[in-house]
Amino acid sequence: MDRPTRRSFLVSAVAGPAAASRISAAPTQARYRILGKTGLKVSEVGFGTEAVSDISLYQRGLDFGINFFDTARDYERGSSERMLGKALAARRKDVVFCSRSYAKDARQFSADLDLSLKETGTDYFDIFYIGAKDNPKDVPDDMLEAQAAAQKAGKIRLKGLSTHRIRAMEPLLARQHFDVVLVPYNFTKGKFDYTPSVDEQAIEKCHKDGLGVVAMKVMAGGARFNRERNLPLKGFFDKNPGAHLSALKWVLRSPFIHTTVPRMTSVEMLEENVRAMSERYGAEDEKILIAHLERIRPYVCRMCGACDGACPRGLPVSDLVRYVTYADGYGDFPMGYRRFQALPAEVRAVRCMDCRSCAVRCPNGVRVRDRLIRAQELFA
């Protein structure tokens, strides 16, 4: 998908005045794509609302032309839906409003939907996801029926699925129940990583099948938001100027991604993300991200699934690494803690320090044992 660029980038060194100028340039207005067969016109960069405490940021996003807003009831310690509903009330028909349920059964899904509608003060969601499902067995038929019934009743316009494992969910997607899929997609899945970008093939298929494709986890760990000195991801974006902008441009280079939902907690982040919509991904960005990938490699899960079932003590390895990233990368300890505490008691009781060595080996270079111990230290 061709998009006009505001200026050309010279192939140059990563650091120095050129890199600094990339960060300081003024933002422009939003650009738009069509969300699959839904026909909805959505801004290429949407608004991920985790950890947003300043309601004026939403108004600023609207001023830039952002019209896609993604939330969940557990974001920002339970206040995100209420705050976003208030912010969007006057522009409700102009925006795409999304939320989700992490329910395990149909009854809870329906209850979650009704409560989210009440919290936001809206009559309907444009998209309501069955959230965080990575195995088709975790989505029973009666939950699909409940989602379809909600659509028929006008409580939701489009049926969504949120997953961290799009390949694993392909059999469910093949049933053609869903209208929109929310998936991780970032530069760690690019040609310069160790594993083949098979997720890109699955995403392309979703696009060709008419599904709306929304990308999450677009910053590959969110390290830009970390400000605490004692955390391992501190300062990675600071050490690699322009990495945040380049990471989002990498995602937007794909014609199979219709919109994205990066979290934004400041005007600076918002303006930089808006810039990404008007600048092409180029050779300079490639250099920046190659360097950045090597810095984050030991810490950030690619969600490739290679470690599934590898722990002899039954730990959900990739989930635990992701929960640590919520705390250490995003600076969102409460989210990581809630996810960890939702695990079965026998999983929460495991201590990796008890093992002499770790049976899990990551093909992408994540230091699995260190990350799991970190999760247990933080959340157990």
Q: Predicted regions: what is each one?
A:
Residues 35, 47, 69, 84, ...:
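Conserved, mostly hydrophobic/aromatic
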Residues 68-87:
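Glycine-rich, proline-tolerant flexible connector loops at the mouths of alpha/beta enzymes
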